[in-house]
Amino acid sequence: MATSCESTVLKPDGKLNSHVKIPIAHPRSSSTIRFDPPKTHDMVRSLFDPTLKKSFLECCITATIIGNVILCYYAYQHLGANTTKIIFLSQYIFWRLSYNLGIGIVLHYQSHYESLTNFAKKHTLFDKKANNLLSRFVKFEISAKYQKGDSLYRYPEEWNTWLLFRQFVDLILMQDFTTYMLYVVISLPHNDILNNITSFNSIGIRVWLGVLMVLFNIWVKIDAHSVVKDYAWYWGDFFFLQDANLVFDGVFNVFPHPMYSIGYIGYYGLSLISGDHHVLFVSILGHCLQFLFLKYVETPHIERIYGSDSSDEEESIDDKMVKQLDNYSKPLVTTFLGFKNFDKFKPTDYITLITVASIVIGCTILNPSFVTLSKIALTTKIVSSVINMTILYKQSNSKWFTSLYLKNGYNEIYAYQMWQFIYNLHSTINYILLVLQCYYHFVKCDSGSYNTITFGLLLLAIQIWCNTEIFHSIKEFGWFYGDFFLPNLIDKRKLKNDGIYRYLNNPERVFGVAGIWGTVLINNFSNWNLWLATTWTMFNWFTVKFIETPHLLKVYGTKPTSSGFEKTLTKYKFGKDFKSLIDKVDQLLDDYLFTSLVPKQSVAEADREGDWESIINMLLIREQTVKNLQGTGHFNLDIVNINDENTIRIPEEIEIKWAVTNEAFHKDDWIGLYKVVETGEDRLTTKIPSQGHWSAVSSSSSYSEDHQKILHFDSNDHFTYGSIKFDKSILCFEEGIYEFRYHSANSHDVVMISKPFKLLFPQFKETVKDVDQLIATTKQFLKQCGVLINDNKFDLNRNKYFTGKTLQNWYKSTMDTDVSVVYMKRTNFDIDIITKKVWQIKQVLDNLE
């Protein structure tokens, strides 16, 4: 037990063994009696420090340890290694069951009924006046645990019962440890280790890696005990409680349940050193029993005493969506054991199920080779990852995926459901192909050893555990990137910092691919599995680094805080240096990717984004070049009604004045309207058709009347001149930078080119305040374009140049959003319905920002 100036308490959020160091804590019994605990010592010092007084049971424990060592030596000498292994394996199983089953049952009853405490009270074991044999023995036993001048009668029964319980725990734990270590020692290939310990070969690497794991395990145990002291080490809160504030520290900041998780990494280190798969299987058995003890003994007690995790108490976003939204059900999630949330009324769930069945049946019938299946798995992973990353990136920047469904008449919830289906389907296909690939390698190729396969399965188990913890913490909403699609549903703009996220900010980057690397071990370091694991890890890292992290900053306004692992690491100088190095490499990588790989803005992109001025200035220089080529300068092609900004608003009529020498004029001359980016660099010949956007300059031409928009025509002794108009019947209805070209006779030879100008839709963004105003503005615009009938319908046949795409672009220009042409057709081009839908989409997208 820790001293009164440095006590410990379990974390009251349901997380087991999250103990903390605190300044002052006064224990209290179940009867609320508060007391200052005496000083206690850890197990090793209590047993082996000769300066400390020993109790009778402690002497017995020491004797049993020595006896087991002697037994091991003589059994090995006279009975052989195999028989000795059986003896100590049997002992280990007995003591391990005594620990996990025996102590587990005792603690279970103590937790629920205070059985040990009540037994002590009922039989007056610690009563000063009690004189029965059991009472005298108990008092004699624990009196050795008190310092001189202190008395057991000063403390409540709960404390004394706990001290006595510790003695039996020490016996079981020390025998459990001793018999396991002796079993491992007997299993060691001593000659192989001694001959290869200084060599850089598989055996030498394996041995040194195992040694490092054992040393790490020792550090975990020492650090854990320095944090939790004896109180939590010996399950003190099953007997009495302590009041204190919580401050996480040490190894409990690095990993959940460290005494049960990484606290057993030494088992696997010893398995590596021995190279014996029997030792590995025994270690796994012991570790699994420990996890069962954690699950069925400690966790229920912690939740009962301190309450469950706070995240479980709060209603998740998914539960709120199910309750508040019509036609929404929780998404299908493919797990290691099958499907979660399967809905027999959702067709997409059946698609996923049929896809899995088709892949398995197809592989059974076609029986592809391992290489073929590996190529399919690798290609599928690359394609699906690129699709997922593209959707998430565009969704984060422009709500592209949601807009796509909104434009086609669906709502944002349906869009999110479709993303859930796509993401889960991709994950399911990738994992089922990986499982089949491993199976085919196991059947058709050389499989690895028992050790590599077992360690591979352990890595797979780590990934399953990691995914389970992540899902438990962030639920379906976080699992399916809900904050990319429905950030408006987030009540608290605060990043998760509980569960596994207390220890690691992005656990999926490390443990989320552990099982993928486990397949490398299972498939005996196959090159194809190395490629798969590398690809999987790279896409995982890229997604977190360049998509998730920037989006979290955008939505939550802050980056994730330092994880427990990072805080613990930076306490040490080497940790600070290592983190500094990682940060520098990370920054260099960012600089390289964003300066070398991100393409610079092109002219076409500038055109799309509205950066018109630089393009127009460039084209004015080209215009002067054409004039110089004409030589005389007696050529003129001017736009009459252009403003100072070189802009004309659709559908204004455009008047053009022209003049050429009589020698250059031909009655079949004509003027065409072209988009600058489509005409290319050739300023002497137009190599693209005008698509009907042209007019003759003379009424005596051989052209049809539809293309004779002549306002004026005349000539004198030197020049022929006139003016024409481009009205809505031949005008372009697409925004962009345009120019007029005067062509000679019935050819595409350019005589002169007008000044470039911008053709834009009217701007109403600032003036449109509500949906009714938007409807009125849209109808007015369509009426000016001559495509509105019955005061409410858009008629596609009124103007072949004003299409559904044009109307879509109008809404995009006016409201920064639009609907699809398919949706327009479904409404029979009803302007009221279409405009109301556009307004609704705008409100939804604004709400998602």
Swiss-Prot record:
Enzyme category, top tier: transferase
Membrane topology: Multi-pass membrane protein
GO BP: any one term: methylation
GO cellular component: endoplasmic reticulum membrane
Family annotation (Pfam families): PEMT
Locations listed in the record: Endoplasmic reticulum membrane
Major subcellular site: endoplasmic reticulum
Keywords noted in UniProt: Endoplasmic reticulum, Lipid biosynthesis, Lipid metabolism, Membrane, Methyltransferase, Phospholipid biosynthesis, Phospholipid metabolism, S-adenosyl-L-methionine, Transferase, Transmembrane, Transmembrane helix
InterPro entries for the chain: Phopholipid_MeTrfase, Phosphatid-EA_MeTrfase_fun
TM regions (residue ranges): 56-76, 86-106, 168-188, 200-220, 232-252, 265-285, 351-371, 376-393, 418-438, 452-472, 510-530
Lumenal face residues: 1-55, 107-167, 221-231, 286-350, 394-417, 473-509
GO molecular function, one term: phosphatidylethanolamine N-methyltransferase activity
Reactions catalysed according to its record: a 1,2-diacyl-sn-glycero-3-phosphoethanolamine + S-adenosyl-L-methionine = a 1,2-diacyl-sn-glycero-3-phospho-N-methylethanolamine + S-adenosyl-L-homocysteine + H(+)
Cytoplasmic topological domain: 77-85, 189-199, 253-264, 372-375, 439-451, 531-849
EC numbers for this chain: 2.1.1.17
Annotated metabolic or biological route of this protein: Phospholipid metabolism; phosphatidylcholine biosynthesis
UniProt key word Magnesium: no
Role summary: Catalyzes the first step of the methylation pathway of phosphatidylcholine biosynthesis, the SAM-dependent methylation of phosphatidylethanolamine (PE) to phosphatidylmonomethylethanolamine (PMME).
Family assignment from sequence similarity: Belongs to the class VI-like SAM-binding methyltransferase superfamily. CHO2 family.
Protein name, entry field: Phosphatidylethanolamine N-methyltransferase
Organism expressing this protein natively: Kluyveromyces lactis (strain ATCC 8585 / CBS 2359 / DSM 70799 / NBRC 1267 / NRRL Y-1140 / WM37)
